[in-house]
């Protein structure tokens, strides 16, 4: 979220909204780490989300976060992030600008101090894929 806030000419992505949009994707990415997956499942248990398996619990946690975004009128992805942070069919970050700046944003995100505490350490390719998932609201399957 730190590296995308002011990266685009069309406008500023509010830091809290960026975190809200990215968190479901980041959880899915990090859940490939066994210890992180167990912790996410514990969170789901603590707030009584249900689910029988670790994966089901994580899915319910992600579902809750997406529902909260809907209730707070926060878009699910950068592509639909509109003026004032509101959902829009065409957001403030055009696809061509996003793709042009993607390698630089990904490289800067890898170097961000917060990334060092992440359960999985993404390389350039993974970070670009994760950011694309955050732009298009596509499934994290890597």
Set out the residue ranges of the language-model regions.
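Oxyanion-binding "anion nests"
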Residues: 1
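Gly/Pro-rich interdomain helix-loop hinge
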Residues: 4-97
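Short, amphipathic C-terminal "tail helix"
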Residues: 96-142
């Amino acid at each position: 979220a730190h590296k995308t806030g002011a990266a685009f000419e069309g406008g500023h992505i509010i830091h809290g909204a960026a975190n809200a949009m990215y968190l479901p994707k980041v959880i899915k990415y990090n859940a490939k780490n066994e210890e992180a997956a167990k912790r996410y499942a514990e969170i789901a248990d603590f707030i009584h989300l249900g689910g029988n398996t670790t994966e089901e619990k994580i899915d319910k946690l992600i579902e809750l976060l997406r529902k909260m975004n809907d209730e707070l009128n926060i878009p699910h992805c950068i592509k639909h992030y509109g003026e004032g942070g509101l959902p829009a069919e065409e957001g403030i970050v055009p696809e061509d600008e996003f793709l042009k700046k993607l390698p630089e944003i990904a490289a800067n995100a890898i170097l961000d101090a917060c990334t060092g505490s992440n359960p999985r350490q993404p390389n350039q390719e993974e970070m670009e894929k994760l950011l694309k998932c955050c732009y298009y609201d596509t499934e994290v399957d890597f």
